[in-house]
UniProtKB/Swiss-Prot annotation:
Organism of derivation: Escherichia coli O139:H28 (strain E24377A / ETEC)
Keyword presence, Membrane: yes
Residue segments, region Disordered: 39-66
Recorded family membership: Belongs to the UPF0370 family.
Biased composition (Basic and acidic residues): 42-51
Topology versus the membrane: Single-pass membrane protein
HAMAP family: UPF0370
InterPro entries registered for this protein in UniProt: UPF0370 (IPR020910)
Annotated protein name in UniProt: UPF0370 protein YpfN
Superkingdom of source: Bacteria
GO CC annotation terms, alphabetical: plasma membrane
Location of this chain's protein in the cell: Cell membrane
Keywords assigned by UniProt, alphabetized: Cell membrane, Membrane, Transmembrane, Transmembrane helix
Membrane-crossing residue ranges in chain numbering: 4-24
Length: 66
């Protein structure tokens, strides 16, 4: 087990290379042209930030300084 304490980083590199090869292999299977041709429509983005727009913290130019 002394070799494992000395060379643990080689096992990590082998693992990362394996993960990288699997990612590349899976990405080659993706057909981006087919996906873009049949891309589903996204619904409009809804956020509720418009309520915050009424609460303006900036001072108005017409108001005199207090």
């Amino acid at each position: 087990m002394d070799w494992l304490a000395k060379y643990w980083w080689i096992l990590v590199i082998v693992f990362l290379v394996g993960v990288l090869l699997n990612v590349i292999k899976d990405l080659k299977r993706v057909d981006h042209k087919k996906f873009l041709a049949n891309k589903p429509e996204l619904p409009p983005h809804r956020d509720f930030n418009d309520k915050w727009d009424d609460d303006d913290d900036w001072p108005k130019k017409d108001q005199p300084k207090k």
